[in-house]
């Protein structure tokens, strides 16, 4: 590597990090028509009539993770063909390196159990994103409980083992729902987003909980793992991923992550499979704001995500459960 390239990598933060610093990559597995931005246009009863693209996009993410963590010598095997002859290849056995936690919507898992098993077999974590992608804070508690239990049971039946984590759709959480999540047997929740300017995000009071790494210890066997944001001058700046990752220049976003990792041992990032899919249908009936939120820089996300991970190649990429087990 030339001196000029080394200097540039140093300026970008490449090569930074140690074995104790960790990036928790989380993927909310839902389709483009499930999002809250389009809820007034696309009713849940019509979901089956739309082209599903979540399977293809999730496999693209799996392939990217496997390519990044490849040892020098490894045998690739082909996955099954998708519509329009789309194929992927990656190792068939779990390998050390980049692992992620996939919060899978029950609606998706019910229709695509093979995808769930594939995620699990590659060593990633299968977690719950609820069943029907409704804002939990707007639902009756008994309905939320049924949604949570149904999604957990479905995922556990598919992978043949326990599911430890939950994330509410659109981070719609409150203290009553948090108690429900604990009562239904999860080890952790990852629904709390401290950025309060988004009205969909819920609120919980964690001031009485013990700080353990970047997690909050709610009880002896239950943790909250909040989305990472920048705390600056009494403000919360959104820097956990999703649309904010697509909106900010990569150099600025990575700088924010490094700032957080100087204060904390871990960083929690989130993304959706539809955010890497420039070819998805356009919902032109949605408002300008909703369309901006959903489509901004969507053509650049895949390459940007890969570049983001490579900037932190000297860090560890465990699953959420692995992180909590190590606390």
Language-model segments: residues:
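Surface-exposed cleft-lining segments at the edges of enzyme active sites
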Residues: 163, 237-247
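Catalytic alpha-helical scaffold of carbohydrate-active enzymes acting on polysaccharides/glycoconjugates
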Residues: 2-165, 170-232, 252-327
């Amino acid at each position: 590597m030339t001196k000029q390239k080394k200097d540039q990598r140093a300026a970008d933060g490449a090569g930074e990090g140690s074995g104790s610093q960790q990036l928790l990559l989380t993927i909310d597995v839902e389709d483009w028509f499930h999002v809250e931005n389009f809820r007034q246009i696309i009713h849940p009863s019509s979901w089956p009539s739309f082209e599903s693209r979540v399977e293809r996009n999730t496999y693209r993410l799996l392939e990217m993770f496997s390519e990044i963590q490849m040892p020098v010598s490894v045998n690739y095997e082909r996955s099954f063909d998708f519509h329009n002859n789309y194929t992927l290849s990656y190792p068939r056995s779990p390998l050390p390196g980049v692992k992620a936690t996939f919060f899978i919507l029950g609606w998706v898992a019910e229709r695509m159990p093979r995808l769930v098993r594939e995620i699990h077999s590659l060593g990633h974590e299968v977690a719950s994103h609820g069943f029907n992608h409704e804002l939990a804070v707007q639902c009756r508690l008994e309905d939320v409980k049924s949604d949570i239990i149904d999604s957990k049971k479905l995922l556990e039946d598919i992978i043949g083992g326990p599911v430890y984590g939950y994330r509410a759709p659109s981070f719609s959480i409150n203290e009553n729902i948090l108690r429900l999540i604990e009562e239904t047997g999860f080890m952790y929740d990852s629904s709390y987003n401290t950025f309060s300017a988004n009205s969909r995000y819920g609120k919980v009071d964690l001031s009485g909980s013990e700080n353990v790494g970047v997690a909050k210890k709610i009880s002896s066997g239950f943790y909250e793992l909040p989305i990472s944001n920048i705390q600056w001058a009494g403000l919360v700046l959104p820097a956990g991923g999703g649309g904010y990752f697509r909106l900010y220049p990569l150099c600025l976003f990575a700088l924010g992550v490094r700032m957080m990792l100087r204060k904390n041992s871990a960083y929690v990032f989130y993304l959706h499979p539809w955010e890497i899919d420039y070819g998805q249908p356009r919902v032109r009936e949605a408002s300008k704001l909703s369309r901006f939120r959903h489509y901004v820089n969507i053509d650049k996300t895949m390459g940007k995500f890969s570049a983001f991970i490579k900037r932190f190649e000297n860090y560890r990429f465990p699953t959420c459960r692995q992180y909590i087990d190590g606390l």
